[in-house]
Amino acid sequence: MTVLAAHRLQGAEPLLPSLQARLACRAGNAQQTAGVAPGFVQGNLAILPEKLAASFHRFCQLNPKPCPIIGMSDVGDPNLPALGRDLDIRTDLPRYRVWRDGELVDEPTDILAHWRDDLVAFVIGCSFSFEEALLADDLPIRHIELGVRVPMYRTNIACAPSGPFAGPMVVSMRPMKPADAIRAVQITSRFPAVHGAPVHLGLPQSIGITDLAKPDYGDPVPINDDEIPVFWACGVTPQAVIAAARVPFAITHSPGLMLVTDLKNKQLAVL
């Protein structure tokens, strides 16, 4: 019997949609999470050995646009109670990526077999939070309309280095009409904890992107003739940096398959 089924049989209060989403992941549901548990904050994941944690924490502090930390575990502790009830970082994402010496070696649906007592988990803000605010203002979001993952690209924008961690910023892209893009800048500026305002509008080649139809992560989406690409700093940046640093061991989320927390998106707005 699942935890959710047992909870229902006990006649307890309804579970938060965020906890239901995590329990679904724990049961092996490996679906992309855009639009899942509306109203709740989602996060990117990076897990590193303790000896690298301080350098990575500093890297995030130096690069708050792509790497805004919303949660951090104690050493060896897979639970992050500040982010959610009964949250287990080893099982509660749809899919993970395991890295050794900068190479992707596994993409499991849980990391129980990979967990170690020296690991520290970092949860980094995700643009899915500000997408809710965009939708509330009737701004269309193409990848949600199509039911695919947001397209993400490595750029020529260099992150500030810290220890072994250095490399390019990764950005997510959403096509918008110019007037909608201006409104999107205004809306997302209210959410610095989840990447804030865009880092670039239009002209993808000027930030090192040669073909929008071939994202480095996620899925391509069509851009209409009356639209421009709008780029936000992205929490997949640590994956590019971890690969470039060739650290001996690391775990991340699979792009587009995030951790759903119990935090509310409205808690992250600054205005």
UniProtKB/Swiss-Prot annotation:
It is an enzyme of class 4 (lyase). The keyword Ribosomal protein does not apply. The keyword Transport does not apply. Keywords: Lyase. One of its GO terms (molecular function) is lyase activity. Its EC number is 4.2.1.-. NCBIfam families: PRK05463.1. Belongs to the D-glutamate cyclase family. This is Putative hydro-lyase RPE_1692. It comes from Rhodopseudomonas palustris (strain BisA53).
